[in-house]
């Protein structure tokens, strides 16, 4: 039965010719079982985590997210996300940026959206605000002698939902540089990283505009505003 947990005791042996299955991790071996015990039984699952086709609707998948995450596609996405984070750390560390986690509970610093407010248990009637961005903290770091800072920052913005997404919580590569002359210095600093991530993880060039294709050494076109 699907999802039953069993304990099989026996001898691991190589599968015979014609019995090997290259599509599974254990496809070259089998267990010659001496004893089989059911440790836990399971009811029929609301969604089938290993079936890529004919999946349940999105609402049901979100309700049983812990099962949906077991799908090979979702597992692959989690691994890609972790690898992307590793690449970002590697790139920024290699350019002498220092990773620093700034506080999550702080005073309000409006940045164009509404704050998520958290009531204080110790100070009645007062609230913490979840950061829309670490703006104030990273500027204080510059004053404190940290000339090149970065983090993969959690940002919280109480914005109205769009048709297909809610912006409430997201993560961004946040950075700050002391004595940067202009925004172009910052763009030039991170441009190679953006190209690398787009090429390696999306399998495509980041942008193709007016025959100027990113990925061939050309700079990303600048759009004024």
Name what the model sees in each region.
Residues 1-225:
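Class II aminoacyl-tRNA synthetase catalytic cores and aaRS-like
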């Amino acid at each position: 039965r699907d999802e039953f947990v069993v304990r099989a005791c026996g001898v691991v042996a190589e599968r015979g010719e014609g019995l090997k299955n290259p599509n599974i991790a254990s496809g070259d071996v089998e267990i010659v079982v001496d004893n089989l015990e059911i440790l836990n039984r399971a009811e029929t699952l609301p969604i089938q985590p290993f079936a890529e086709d004919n999946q349940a609707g999105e609402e049901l998948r979100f309700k049983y997210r812990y099962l949906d995450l077991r799908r090979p596609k979702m597992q692959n996405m989690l691994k890609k996300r972790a690898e992307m984070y590793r690449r970002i750390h590697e790139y920024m560390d290699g350019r002498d940026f220092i990773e620093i986690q700034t506080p999550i509970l702080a005073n309000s610093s409006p940045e164009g959206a509404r704050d998520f407010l958290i009531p204080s248990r110790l100070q009645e009637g007062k609230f913490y605000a979840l950061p829309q961005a670490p703006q104030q903290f990273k500027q204080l770091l510059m004053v404190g002698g940290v000339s090149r800072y970065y983090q993969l920052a959690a940002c919280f913005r109480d914005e109205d939902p769009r048709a297909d997404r809610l912006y409430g919580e997201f993560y961004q590569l946040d950075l700050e540089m002391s004595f940067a002359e202009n925004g172009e210095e910052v763009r030039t600093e991170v441009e190679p990283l953006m190209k690398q991530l787009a090429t390696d993880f999306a399998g495509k060039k980041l942008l193709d505009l007016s025959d100027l294709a990113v990925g061939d050494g050309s700079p990303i076109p600048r759009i004024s505003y």
